[in-house]
Design a protein with these regions (language model features):
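Mature extracytoplasmic enzyme cores
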Residues: 8-19, 37-211
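N-terminal-proximal low-complexity accessory segments that begin disordered
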Residues: 1-34
Length: 218
């Protein structure tokens, strides 16, 4: 990392082959001065691939500038709230925000936002990530890269995962109104056991189908 130079990138790739390593991952990390996914970045990727082809090693791309994978070095989450990670909390206290969900009993719920990561439950977010990161690599290098390393994609752990796609998805899966059931995710009332099982099944399906599967299919 720091400021990349193709000659130094080739030297490092060659050294890894010399000591018996079968390949390497091209991973942007803290301290990188070269613009990630810019022309100079790809010049260095080309240099590393060329050296791997000479040495018979494997050149793998890492799909993010840091981790967890999915935010596209800030370009995906930078598109706004629709693309940013969201979560629900249940807390006693005064009103904190105007971003409100109200259930049929008049209980107010508020979702909070992590602006530094993305909503991995919404497929449009994943397709934008693929467009900004995966497709430029393929356009430039085709099958000369062995594959991609994707690291720690995740749902929110700050509260219960939330996404704007959830109410409609829950309705389609269970024929029920999720907004009316939100209190059951936090308190042992109503059909809370069933609601929680359904909720986490939905979260699992959304993450698998809307984040992991599009990347796998690509």
């Amino acid at each position: 990392n720091e400021t990349l130079e193709p000659s130094e990138t080739k030297r490092q790739a060659k050294e890894m082959a010399r000591i018996g390593m079968g390949g390497f991952f091209m991973h942007a990390r803290g301290g990188l001065q070269t613009e990630y996914m810019g022309d100079e970045w790809f010049d260095n990727v080309e240099a590393a691939i060329c050296q791997s082809e000479e040495d018979g090693t494997e050149a793998w791309a890492y799909d993010e500038n840091g981790w967890p994978s999915g935010f596209g070095s800030g370009k995906v989450n930078g598109l706004g709230i629709d693309y940013q990670q969201k979560y629900l909390r249940f807390e006693d206290g005064e009103k904190q925000t105007d971003t409100t969900i109200v259930n049929k009993d008049g209980v107010h719920f508020y979702y909070d936002i992590n602006p530094f990561y993305v909503d991995t439950l919404d497929s449009k977010v994943t397709h934008k990530f693929i467009e900004l990161i995966y497709e430029p690599y393929y356009d430039k290098f085709k099958n000369r890269i062995t594959g991609f390393f994707s690291d720690e994609p995740q749902i929110s752990r700050n509260g219960l995962p939330w996404s704007f796609v959830m109410p409609q998805t829950y309705k389609e899966m269970y024929g029920d109104n999720l907004l009316d059931k939100l209190i059951e995710l936090f308190k042992p009332v109503g059909d809370y056991k069933q609601t929680r099982i359904r909720y986490w099944k939905m979260v699992t399906d959304l993450f698998s189908n809307n984040f992991m599967k599009p990347i796998y299919d690509w």
